[in-house]
Amino acid sequence: MYPFKKILVALDATSMDEALIQFASFLAHNTPAESVHFVNVIKSTQLPSSLKKEFPNLMEAAIQDRKKMLEKIIIEHFDMTNHEIKVKISVEQGNLPSKHVLKLAEKHNIDAIVVGRKKKLKNSSVVTQRLARRATCSLLIVPEKEYTNMNRIMVATDFSKESATALQEAIVVAERGTHAGQDVEIICHHVYQVPIGYHYTGKSYDECGDVMQKNAKKQYRAFIDKIDTQGIEIKPLFSWDRNDNVVAVIYEKALQMDVNCIVIGGKGKSASTDFFPIGTNTERLISRDTEIPLLIVRPKHVNAGLMEMLQKI
């Protein structure tokens, strides 16, 4: 686990930016953040040579105008009272926003990338999935809504080392919130299933479900014993997935319990592969049109093949 000291926020000059800036402000003041870097990518346009000759600084002027516009919105929605947090704004030019975001994240050794999820844009998860697979740091996906607190965090766990990392990150956020006078609750949620072929055991479906739950509770005790909870209370939750849809169970429980953020562990990347395997359930959570922020926590790596990978995006 590593603290979120450097945060990169991807803006797109739409109404979504207000929610992103507001959430970035909340995140920065509830983590050990030292800097927040806002970036926006303006689409490259092929201008006729005559127009370029007449207005040689047209694109530069557009970039400066965009930067001034973003500065105004950021001042309105980002809490600047903590002068120790450095705020930077960059406006880039290109046709693939995700590529520029990834390059900036690598260049500035970013710990977490924050991106938005629009309500009305059903295909917005395509860019987000690209970032989730290829970013060398954690990714926070923020739906288009207003945020005022984060007092209930759900960590989806399968008791793996990735889940342990996700829980530790949630503990950091909860600890900061507690110090600020907030009552933050962490729910460690495990979804279990009855395996195919259960009938060969001679037990009924419900009996096998009971066995799986007992086993999950045993695994949880072994899992939580290795975690430094920093005095934060962790509440275990065990849910039985009867319809072969783990993601639906996670999300429905999160809605029922009024969860402010779902945290899940993502895998790291080996030097021999071009993509980060984020896991089937993580990918389905990204694709789902949720109203709850999703934080994908992954180990931070710098690989020799990174630049080659970026060229393929």
Segments predicted by a language model, with ranges:
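Small/aliphatic-rich secondary-structure junction motif
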Residues: 1-56, 152-209, 228-232, 288-289, ...
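Structural beta-alpha unit
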Residues: 1-2, 43, 57, 75-113, ...
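Short glycine-rich, flexible loops that bind phosphorylated cofactors or substrates
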Residues: 16, 121-122, 162, 246, ...
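Conserved N-terminal ligand/cofactor-binding loop architecture of enzyme catalytic domains
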Residues: 43, 49-52, 56-68, 75-77
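Structured core of small recognition/catalytic domains
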Residues: 181-263
